[in-house]
Amino acid sequence: MKRKRYEMEKKKKTEIQTAIEELSVFIVTKPADKTEATHIPLRPILSFCSLIIQVLDKIGPTMAVLRQDIDQNIQRLEKFYETDSCVYSNLAEILKKEKEEGTSKMVASCGRALFWLTRTMDFTAGLLRLLSKEMSSKMEELVEECYMTTLKPHHGWIASAAFKVCLKLVPDNKTFMEAIGARDESYDTLREDIDTLSSLLTPILKEIYFVLEQYGLSRLRSM
């Protein structure tokens, strides 16, 4: 009995289970004084995006372009954070600083990095929700459906064309399910984990979108 318990405790968590742990302690603080910035912790957001990269790595080289884009945006925010970790542990302070400097909408701004990371998280959450409800559907169909509502409205023709190419490289259901933990977990457990993650992530995304709107960064587009 003890051995079985030890083996269960030793069992490696999936990326989704790790994300649940990260986001379950995520707290957004809204100040009473409206002149102060809402406090949205930066590190858990970056940790979650890093977990997305880990899943993409498991899927293989077909996701290399998306992986690189996410990684570059994470690095951009981390670099800014390191200039004053006490102040910029709050992502709203980063947006506030860039707005004051007039750089928030520049190509290499943290504002743009946060916008696209948020869209990526929204896409990921949407895809997982669809997968939870329709595990028998083809991954290509689920990815395209989710893309149309989360990313396409902000993509220009170049980005949309690139997506169509990537869509042909989407892995099959089995490969993707194994990448997010189905190899060691039952589908019922995986579905429960997905639903838990979605319930945690949805209100967080809502708060981030609200802050992006405050700083005029909710309608950015790529080429």
From Swiss-Prot:
Q: Where is the signal peptide?
A: none
Q: Please name the Gene3D superfamilies in this protein's record.
A: Glycolipid transfer protein
Which controlled-vocabulary keywords does the entry list? Lipid transport, Transport
SUPFAM superfamilies attached to this UniProt entry? Glycolipid transfer protein, GLTP
From the UniProt record, which GO molecular function terms apply?
A: lipid transfer activity
Query: Record's superkingdom?
Result: Eukaryota
Q: Binding of a ganglioside GM3 (d18:1(4E)): at which residues?
A: 69, 73, 116, 155
Any one Pfam family match given in the protein's UniProt record, by short name = GLTP
**One cellular component (GO) term of this entry:** cytoplasm
The UniProt similarity line reads:
Belongs to the GLTP family.
What is the stated purpose of this protein? Transfers glycolipids in vitro.
UniProt protein name: Glycolipid transfer protein 2
